[in-house]
Regions:
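N-terminal subdomain of nucleotide-sugar transferases
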Residues: 1-45, 81, 232
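Active-site proximal beta-strand in glycosyltransferases
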Residues: 4, 101-120
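Conserved catalytic-core segment of nucleotide-activated headgroup transferases in glycan assembly
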Residues: 22-28, 176-252, 263, 267-268
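Membrane-proximal helix-turn-helix segments that form the acceptor-binding/catalytic region
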Residues: 126-145
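Acidic donor-binding loop of glycosyltransferase active sites
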Residues: 143, 275-289, 302
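Carbohydrate-associated surface elements
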Residues: 151, 173
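Short hydrophobic beta-strand element within catalytic cores of glycosyltransferases
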Residues: 293-296, 303-308
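A charged, aromatic-enriched C-terminal amphipathic alpha-helix characteristic of glycosyltransferases
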Residues: 343-369
Length: 369
């Protein structure tokens, strides 16, 4: 097996956000194909790791992004451990990986989760031009790059003159190898848990609600989309909202209880909710990159209704009838798409799992390292 060293720049164990989950699951499945060591933040929970070595060398404070002592420490680990390649999650520690590569001679790979400067620009951060300059530098210095979306890869090639030969696709993966056989059972379980009638369409929204793009999407559901759905008097449904970080001023969505809204908070078995759901809503308007929760929802058999921005990054040709997109900010069309779908009879195509199943992804990446 190839010996690989990876650096994960922020806490990801246990995971709560899509970004954390992406790192955790990618490294877990990569470790099945390689002999993997990961350098992470000291606040990670090592008890959740079973198949790779986790070194808690990164400080929990922001100073970890400028800790020059890591250059020598990681270089020594590369030499004594016999590592053949270095993977950098996100561009934030690209400077460190570049210097370690120069000292040791091993290639380094940049695993991008978004075009980061675009994400922060869409969120109104003043310092996005600084990140843009640094991120472009990192792309050019890396030996190879993994891209989460075809759009990000095309942007790098066209706008930053990155050779396409340096680029590889690495989408957010799913742990389920095929269409679930227990959708009816899971729907009954979740419906019973929340007092939902058997003839009501179960609609799901999920995400880390302290993240502004997700919170904005939730407010669009509450204030724009749901009132339009309610106007369709013959449509029986409930919308379950899952996710931690809901602002206190929304009072656990108590004022929306009579408007078909259920707030479930953070749920440990989110896969059960994905499997139970008839529809999944993704009215995201900003944030960049792929919406990982949407990838999982389709894998577990839900039909996704998404804005064009929300559908960014997903490989649409493998989704079949399970992805419905509407223009951004067209909430009338969004609500109509929901009521038109109701309980979808379509199943997720086999080609979807061929592309997004984690084991397939890890094997493809390991063969290229």
């Amino acid at each position: 097996m190839k010996k690989i060293l990876a650096i994960a720049p922020y806490p990801y164990l246990p995971y709560f956000s899509g970004g954390q989950k992406f790192i955790a699951q990618f490294l877990e499945h990569l470790a099945d194909e390689t002999e993997l060591t990961v350098i992470g933040v000291e606040t990670n929970d090592p008890s959740t790791v079973s198949n790779y070595r986790l070194l808690p060398w990164l400080k929990k404070t922001f100073t970890r992004y400028m800790d020059l002592r890591l250059i020598g420490r990681i270089s020594r680990e590369v030499k004594t451990g016999g590592h053949e390649a270095l993977i950098c999650e996100h561009p934030y520690l690209a400077w460190l990986c570049w210097l370690v590569s120069k000292k040791t001679g091993i290639p380094w790979y940049l695993h991008t989760h978004n075009i980061e400067y675009q994400r922060f620009r869409s969120m109104g951060k003043w310092w996005w031009p600084i990140l843009q300059f640094y991120e472009r530098w990192a792309f050019r210095k890396a030996n190879k790059l993994f891209f989460i979306t075809p759009e990000d890869r095309a942007f790098a090639v066209k706008n930053w003159n990155i050779p396409d030969t340096k680029c590889m696709d690495l989408p957010f993966g799913v742990t389920i190898p095929g269409y679930p056989s227990d959708k009816a059972v899971k729907k009954q379980e979740v419906s019973t848990r929340h007092g939902i009638a058997p003839d009501e369409t179960l609609i799901l929204f999920n995400g880390l609600l302290s993240y502004k793009p997700n919170l904005d999407a939730l407010m669009a559901i509450l204030e724009k989309i749901n009132p339009l759905i309610m106007a369709s008097s013959d449509f029986r449904y409930r919308i379950i909202v899952c996710g931690k970080g809901l602002p206190d001023n929304l009072n656990a969505l108590q004022e929306y209880k009579e408007q078909h809204i259920i707030y479930a908070g953070f749920v440990e078995d989110i896969e059960s909710y994905f499997t139970a759901a008839d529809l999944f809503l993704n009215p995201v308007q900003s944030g960049g990159g792929i919406k990982t929760k949407m990838v999982e929802a389709i894998a577990y058999g839900a039909t996704v209704i998404a804005t064009e921005t929300g559908a960014t990054g997903i490989l649409r040709e493998v989704c079949g009838e399970k992805l419905i997109t509407v223009p951004d900010n067209d909430w009338t069309s969004f609500a109509k798409a929901v009521t038109d779908q109701r309980e979808s009879l379509f199943v997720t195509p086999h080609s979807y799992y061929e592309y997004y199943y984690w084991k397939n992804l890890a094997r493809r990446i390991a063969s290229r390292l």
